[in-house]
Amino acid sequence: MRLLWKLVILLPLINSCAGESRFTRPIFIQEPQDVIFPLDLSRSEIILSCTASGYPSPHYRWKQNGTDIDFSMTYHYRLDGGSLAISSPRTDQDIGIYQCLATNPVGTILSRKAKLQFAYIEDFETKSRSTVSVREGQGVVLLCGPPPHFGELSYDWTFNDNPLYVQEDKRRFVSQNTGNLYIAKVEPSDVGNYTCFVTNKEAHRSVQGPPTPLVQRTDGVMGEYEPKIEVRFPETIQAAKDSSVKLECFALGNPVPDISWRRLDGSPMPGKVKYSNSQATLEIPKFQQEDEGFYECVAGNLRGRNLAKGQLIFYAPPEWEQKIQNTYLSIYDSLFWECKASGNPNPSYTWLKNGERLNTEERIQTENGTLIITMLNVSDSGIYQCAAENKYQTIYANAELRVLASAPDFSKNPIKKISVVQVGGDISIECKPNAFPKASISWKRGTENLKQSKRVFFLEDGSLKICNVTRSDAGSYTCVATNQFGNGKSSGSLIVKERTVITVPPSKMDVTVGESIVLPCQVSHDPTMEVLFVWYFNGDVIDLKKGVAHFERIGGESVGDLMIRNIQLGHSGKYLCTVQTTLERLSAVADIIVRGPPGPPEDVKVEHISSTTSQLSWRPGPDNNSPIQIFTIQTRTPFSVGWQAVATVPEILNGQTYNATVIGLSPWVEYEFRVVAGNNIGIGEPSKPSELLRTKASIPNVAPVNINGGGGSRSELVITWEPIPEELQNGEGFGYIIMFRPVGSTTWMKEKVALVESSKFIYRNESIMPLSPFEVKVGVYNNEGEGSLSTVSIVYSGEDEPRLAPRGTSVQSFSASDMEVSWNAIAWNRNTGRVLGYEVLYWTDNSKESMIGKIRVSGNVTTKNITGLRANTIYFASVRAYNTAGTGPSSPPVNVTTKKSPPSQPPANIAWKLSNSKLCLNWEHVKTMENESEVLGYKILYRQNRQSKTHVLETNNTSAELLVPFEEDYLIEIRTVSDGGDGSSSEEIRIPKMSSLSSVGVQILKPSTQFLTMVGFFYCFVIQPLSR
């Protein structure tokens, strides 16, 4: 009966909550702030801001000093939106603490406390101030005595009529706490009138006090005395977090005291500390916990020192560490909220509901920032505030508690309409209706109630779980939810699919670099389901869409084979084929081992090096899955072409050998070494080169070759040889040893040539007869000693130039462009000079200054044809003998005139006729110009079309017959013959083979005319000339 009454009471509330589910609580956008209002300001209104969001829009109330403001009773206060406007503010009525309250159907929130104060400063009294008399050297304090005020003040002093304020220094100080002016030691220049100026920043007003006269006494000068501290800071100062703290300390004394500061706990002053010019003010900006402690001011001079000290105590208003959050609970549930705030001193906590203090009772308990409400009912809904307060400030954390009571409802969270599972799989169908309190759940399959079994389970959250699903489990399932407020139900269908199976998985493979392989991945699956294949390599997805090099997916819908083309060492690893459907994810993995040539050996070092050997060590590189079988050592020098393999000890370096001796090196040569490894797959990349090292020096062991010489001047022996390459010089200080003696002599003469690049030595001696034979040997040496000598060669000494000129010189022109020069050979002997050949000189007038050229012939040749001459031109020629010493005297010059130029016009109007194997040709006689040679005859040049060999027929007539087998096309051209040479040729004529002609014809060619003519019984064909 009691439960029934509860339901009767709750039903209206439940209906109301259903309509309010879309309401949102008020949240402050803008809260009132502390205001110090200047009384003298002409503005006649104060605005305390307050704005809140929420749906529906909140309405506002205000409290002053804890009492609601009744806006209906006065026009002095009015609402401007949510803000409070105070017209014609008055100190006696309006000063105090204000709070804004924002309310909508969800609840009420209370704003922070805002303090309203009024800033002012009254005028100084107008009565005169007493004169202050001091001795020179004495300290003095001039009192300001500010008038009644409220708000922060600042102080300045002026001296006499000077508009500038008195500047502070070590001797003078204006306290911003008391406003007094302190002069540590009075000087004669200080005498005069002093005026105090006071400014109230909040009140926007400054006032000026009456002047204070300062006069100097005449009864002597003040002697020295120890400092007397007149400005002290309090013994205890409360300093807020992040505030700027200023401590003042100033002393009178003679001499003027020095001010210094320190911390009594011995810790250094914070780096952020600032000092005034006079050191009388210590400022600590952004005050923090670590800045609190005891501070001491020390004032000292020659007469002594004095101290002032005080304690800075850190305080901080509350700051939230943990706030409460909006909470939605079911009726009869329990609420637990906790809020935490930091602060110094530690804050205390108060709880409010809808702006009013929350009273504790049996269900509602509060303790140290926690709130517990048991057996919640709908009336507990509202806006709650946790207030954290210490003596410096109060802060609020706000949250909504919404207590829900409703019958089960599936409208927002129905059962999934279609659930799909595979045979043998497990399926969970969720049932999560909105129900307050929580509903009891039952299930139906079709129209029958479902019971739990070994495969069917009802989970705690109401879900239905079916294990090891069979095809018979398919069908419609309904979830029925019930609580004391009613019931609800929701249905869905279960569809059972066949399982997916990987029928051909990838398998382990062992492959060689450069091969192409296919990793299979084939499945059987339910035909109604799509299958997605994804391949992974060492855990990373292979993105085939981006066209990754080497990888390609091949196969059809049920085949996900992966082809790897030109496989590389980096492709060794694990390959995972995943098969995904909407219901499951299968995978199969295979290891691929890629074998390749070894990687480069590492850490190649030269342990020792001699003149011809080097000891090397190295570490093997990766074997790339195939054991290393052999190492090879290669060297490179500045003289070699690339890297060369070298001989080693041991001769064969197997895969377990990591050091060897290189032999056969050249002394005094810079070498680099590298090591190459090989295995069954091939030869790998070489190692990095070793450091560049030079073999030790040694005596040169290679003698020069091609020992030769001869020539030169009379009384000279010229010896030549092929220089020794730098890589065979074996050390520094390299040079050549020249040994020679006359044939028949037993004594060798010896000379040294120190130039490395030398390949020639000249020995001079007036006693040497021309063409005297010498035995010659050439050797080598360096700083290590003398090396090998070459074999003996015979070299002749220098000779004289020929002394005789050729006789019987003649010249004859054969054409327009060449001539032939003839002479008689010289019968020479040792006294007349050896003749190695002759030199022909030719020119165009009787002076050799117009020399055109010279041509040499060797041996006993006595004629020379000279070509490339100008036509119809007189040429002169002479001949002289030469040998290794030079040329002899020239023969007397002879001359000849070259022939005129050959005809420039080619034969024209060429006609031909062909009968059997006989070709008849006719053409017009060529007429020459005056400067051209007369036509002596004609040349017919003919060849088969596909052959390059040309046949020539000469005739003095303007016709010719050719007897040739015309089995193929012939190409024919005709040119003139004259004393000046052959003239211009006609255009090339193509004579077609017999089989291509229907009868016999005549071809007639003119530059611009083509015509057809009958000759006897033959046809005439006009054929275009071929392009040359």
UniProtKB/Swiss-Prot annotation:
Pfam families: fn3, I-set, Ig_3. Residues 1000-1028 form a propeptide. Residues 887-908 are annotated as: Disordered. Glycans are attached at N65, N193, N368, N377, N468, N659, N765, N860, N865, N895, N931, N956, N957. Residues 887-902 have a biased composition (Polar residues). The keyword Ligase does not apply. It is found in: Cell membrane. It is a lipid-anchor; GPI-anchor. Contactins mediate cell surface interactions during nervous system development. Participates in oligodendrocytes generation by acting as a ligand of NOTCH1. Its association with NOTCH1 promotes NOTCH1 activation through the released notch intracellular domain (NICD) and subsequent translocation to the nucleus. May be involved in motor coordination. This is Contactin-6. It comes from Rattus norvegicus.
